[in-house]
Amino acid sequence: MAKFGSRNKSPKWISNGCCFLLGAFTALLLLWGLCSFIIPIPNTDPKLNSVATSLRSLNFPKNPAATLPPNLQHDPPDTTFYDDPETSYTMDKPMKNWDEKRKEWLLHHPSFGAAARDKILLVTGSQPKRCHNPIGDHLLLRFFKNKVDYCRLHNYDIIYNNALLHPKMNSYWAKYPVIRAAMMAHPEVEWVWWVDSDAVFTDMEFKLPLKRYKNHNLVVHGWEGLVRLNHSWTGLNAGVFLIRNCQWSLEFMDVWVSMGPQTPEYEKWGERLRETFKDKVLPDSDDQTALAYLIATDNKDTWREKIFLESEYYFEGYWLEIVKTYENISERYDEVERKVEGLRRRHAEKVSEKYGAMREEYLKDNKRRPFITHFTGCQPCNGHHNPAYNANDCWNGMERALNFADNQILRTYGYHRQNLLDKSVSPLPFGYPAA
């Protein structure tokens, strides 16, 4: 029995040894495979190396959802302010806790929240009836096209309203019910940008410096000295303004429009505004003088600290002093492009912002295009322009401004107008303006 046992020891030892070697070999294979992931084996193929380098150089976003477009089909059943029957779009009933309600809506719609901080909605409009000026409707169409062009370049949404939302708030007061309703209809936007129908974007590349206004809720073109010290009603212009979509703005507009024609104190406010602003021409209470009054008399900084009076660029500019400068400005821009080949490069319209940003460094010491040319007093729709202006100056000025702006759009399509008072266009040669 002892001999039988000794004869079977050797095969068992060999079998165990084979299993050990097989296991060790498998472990080595696994270790080698793991190391190949942690410490990549150098690749001698230059083509593969080039591809790998290119992939590593791509800056993929940490949060891919942040780069996706808003989901227009997502509206969960969660209750929001829209489901509250007490919520009113009109200015007759104050809105409360708007910041919290807007924030809650954005939490339920996260695809909108990623870009909400800088999102702008441009709002403009005109009266419900046709224009009495024979060319008025044509001019309003061209003014609107100009705004659509600007919004398309910068990916802004735009609303054109021609409905009177409050029967008593007409003329210059008509815009405030529209702005109030737009804020509620668009909780995804941070800013609402009102631009009068008779205002033209004449620098299509320029973007609002929103960081400059991060601590403010209302931006208006104006000068504090003229408003607070001189008490001039033209110390600011309320035809173009940027207002934040927040509770402060809703409360401020409630105070602002309390001087409007829908209130029983309307006539008294007209008298008070004329007493405060001796240069006021209009007898009635108007929104521009009302805003100036709130700024000039706000000694406790109830509102003033959140209002930014912009005077460093043409947030909106007086047309009479601007329209005669277009040709000289165009020549200055052409001069820069002759020196900088990159600015002359043809490109898709969708990437126009890149070239606008590139141009900025060459405009620091030069006069840039006026951002917005505002035809105050020209009344393109009814034709009843300010008697201080010549009618032809108004109509020719509008034509020049619209064509000056349109040239900036047409260039991307390979055309331009040589004469700002001529509607005909010509193809641009390759390499323009150096060609």
From Swiss-Prot:
One Pfam family, short name: Glyco_transf_34
Annotated glycosylation sites: N230, N328
Segments passing through the bilayer: 21-41
Primary subcellular site in the record, as a coarse category: Golgi
Any one biological process term the GO annotation gives: cell wall organization
GO CC term, one of those recorded: Golgi membrane
Domain of life: Eukaryota
Keyword Cytoplasm among record annotations: no
GO MF term list: galactosyltransferase activity
Record-listed E.C. numbers: 2.4.1.-
Broad EC category: transferase
Other remarks in the entry: Galactomannan is accumulated only in the endosperm and constitutes more than 90% of this tissue at maturity. Galactomannan is made by the combined actions of two enzymes: mannan synthase (ManS), which makes beta-1,4-linked mannan backbone, and alpha-galactosyltransferase, which adds galactosyl residues to the mannan backbone. The mannose/galactose ratio of guar galactomannan is 2. The degree of galactosyl substitution on the mannan backbone determines the quality of galactomannan as a gum. A mannose/galactose ratio of 4 provides a gum of higher quality than a ratio of 2.
Family to which this protein belongs: Belongs to the glycosyltransferase 34 family.
Task performed by this protein: Galactomannan galactosyltransferase (GMGT) involved in galactomannan biosynthesis in seed endosperm. GMGT specificity is an important factor regulating the distribution and amount of alpha-1,6-galactose (Gal) substitution of the beta-1,4-linked mannan backbone.
Protein name stated in the entry: Galactomannan galactosyltransferase 1
Source species of the chain: Cyamopsis tetragonoloba (Guar)
Lineage: Eukaryota, Viridiplantae, Streptophyta, Embryophyta, Tracheophyta
